[in-house]
Structures are given as structure tokens and as C-alpha cells.
Regions:
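Short beta-strand/loop motif that positions the catalytic acidic residue
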Residues: 15-16, 22-24
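Conserved alpha/beta-hydrolase "acid-adjacent" motif
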Residues: 29-35
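Hydrophobic alpha-helical segments typical of transmembrane helices
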Residues: 8-9, 34, 49
Length: 97
């Protein structure tokens, strides 16, 4: 079976309500754009870009990675990881009244 493109799943992803932490390394060129796409598409998501890391950022910077993931879990557990403020979307930011 052919694997669908991530971008073809935008509607399904936009319906996700689970808290999501998207983590990419700033030197992982192939994952930066998909990471931004996921951040824009999943309302309860956050994007963490670790500097000077590639695709294996959990191995390259394990202390940083573990700290951020632990903080994410703590925020979710304590109800502090909220959906994105709808006013922050590009269509809302560019509105003129």
C-alpha cells in the first residue's frame, strides 16, 4: 500500500484534539517544513526547534530533549498545555477592521 502524504492528511490532522509536542532539529532540513505544517494544523500542538541538531536530536542533545519533553508532560498533566489562541492564526493576524 502506498503511504499517504502528510499534507494530504490536513483535514484529519486538524481534527486532532490531543496535546502534541513537535520536535525537530534546525539542521534536519527535511523535517522543518513538515514540523511547521503540523504546528499550524494541530490546534493543541507546540513546535520545539533545537539548535545545532539534526534528525537524531534526542541522541545529539539528550539533556535538552529530555528536559523539554518532561516539561511538556508536566504541562499536559497539570492542564497548562492549551489549544492555540485562535487570534494567532495568519488569517486572524492579517485582518483589518
Amino acid at each position: 500500500a502506498e503511504r499517504p502524504s502528510l499534507y494530504d492528511m490536513e483535514n484529519q490532522l486538524s481534527e486532532m484534539k490531543v496535546q502534541t509536542l513537535i520536535v525537530v532539529g534546525d539542521e534536519d532540513d527535511h523535517c522543518l517544513q513538515p514540523g511547521l505544517f503540523l504546528k499550524r494544523t494541530i490546534s493543541a500542538s507546540g513546535l520545539l526547534v533545537l539548535p545545532k541538531t539534526g534528525h537524531t536530536l534526542n541522541l545529539e542533545e539528550p539533556d535538552h530533549f529530555n528536559r523539554f519533553v518532561s516539561d511538556f508532560f508536566s504541562m499536559v498533566e497539570h492542564g497548562r498545555w492549551l489549544d492555540r489562541d485562535p487570534r494567532s492564526t495568519p488569517s486572524e493576524i492579517m485582518k483589518t477592521e
